[in-house]
């Protein structure tokens, strides 16, 4: 563009344009104070207390359990708890069936790839009352797989929620497809977006592909 402009000026030295860029008047608006959303259903502290009644091993993700930690949470922020692999399925079943929690809706199942483990995260919700919870499960990566085969291998597995929530069928297949995490007890565990022979798992940090444009700097 700059080269074309310079060429035009060279050929038309006396040309003058009447065009003037439009100046936009900047509007100012009064500052609006943040209004916290009204709490829906059970509070994070109430939910945590119910979960801890039968599962003493649960803990808050990234926080120490304290009144101050719960008080600092926004009312519409889902409770985020760490649960063991052994308790993951039974805790989800408990939260779904307990009349106080009634977490009958599975919003999502997703994962995060860390250096030596995956975080598997299931988000549940009570469709009647509105409270939500993240069940976060830490899955160590299988270190018995040779380095040269790891990028194209299943590195972790977890119990499937598909018998509890029909929606878990496709959501877990997506995690399997993108992260290479297997789900025990899933009746149709196969790739959902990519071909069965696709090499690797695109949302993992070890994924490589010849068409990936690397970022420099």
Question: Residue locations for each model-derived region?
Answer:
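Terminal low-complexity/charged segments
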Residues: 1-217
């Amino acid at each position: 563009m700059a080269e074309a402009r310079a060429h035009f000026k060279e050929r038309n030295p006396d040309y003058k344009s009447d065009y003037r860029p439009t100046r936009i008047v900047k509007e100012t608006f009064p500052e609006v104070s943040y209004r916290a959303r009204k709490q829906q259903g059970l509070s994070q502290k109430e939910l945590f207390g119910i979960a801890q009644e039968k599962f003493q091993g649960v803990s808050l993700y990234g926080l120490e359990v304290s009144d101050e930690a719960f008080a600092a949470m926004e009312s519409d922020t889902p409770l985020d708890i760490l649960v063991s692999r052994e308790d993951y399925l039974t805790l989800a079943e408990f939260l779904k069936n307990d009349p106080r929690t009634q977490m009958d809706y599975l919003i999502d199942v997703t994962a995060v790839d860390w250096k030596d483990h995956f975080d598997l995260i299931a988000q549940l919700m009570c469709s009647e009352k509105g409270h939500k919870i993240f069940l976060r499960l830490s899955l160590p990566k299988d270190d018995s797989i040779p380095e040269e085969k790891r990028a194209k291998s299943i590195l972790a597995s977890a119990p499937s929620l598909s018998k509890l929530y029909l929606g878990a069928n496709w959501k877990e297949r997506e995690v399997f497809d993108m992260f290479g995490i297997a789900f025990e007890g899933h009746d149709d565990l196969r790739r959902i977006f990519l071909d069965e022979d696709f090499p690797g798992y695109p949302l993992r940090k070890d994924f490589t592909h010849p068409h990936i444009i690397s970022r420099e700097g």
